[in-house]
Amino acid sequence: MMGMMALPGSHDIVRHVLPNGIVILVRENPEVASVVVQGVLDAGTLYDGPGQEGLASFVATMLLRGTQTRDFQAIHESLEGSGAALGLSAGLHYTGFSGRSLAEDLPLLVELLADAVRRPAFPDEQIERLRGQFVTALKIQEQDTRYVAGRMF
């Protein structure tokens, strides 16, 4: 039987508060050579204004489509080159981010995430490409009987 100390819990989570108020929780597992980074930003679809429905989802998706220092290709080549993954998506109350990499590539993962959130570029060609993808997805949803019925009830 495993001892209670072997299970993750509050006893092995370290809490850091950055000067800007961001709270970081860390649980080390030295037996694993990879890291997982997850978090939320107070920017969900609930904050989409009238006539702007879908804006939070669109922006969350656009964040990894280009920054002031990296274009779409450079971001994804960096991720692929290190075997890392990074994603952002908007929920009702929050926009979440999640990433994973080898522990040695954590600085790159954090740098890419910070660049996406702090210095987004919203390149025109990516906006148009994503807009087309969103419109296609909406058209497909409207053909889905289960989706349409779920909206009615």
Residue ranges and their predicted role:
Residues M2-S34:
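N- or domain-start disorder-to-order transition segments that initiate the globular core
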Residues G3-M5, R15-N20, L41, L64-G66, ...:
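A short linear-motif detector with a strong N-terminal bias
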Residues I22, V36, G150-F153:
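Short glycine-rich loop/turn motifs
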Residues I24, A43, K139-I140:
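Contiguous N-terminal and early-domain "leader" segments and peripheral loops that mark the onset or edge
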Residues E31, V36-A103, D124:
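M16/MPP (pitrilysin/insulinase) zinc-metallopeptidase core fold and M16-derived inactive scaffolds
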Residues A74-F153:
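Acidic/histidine-enriched segments that form metal/cofactor-coordinating
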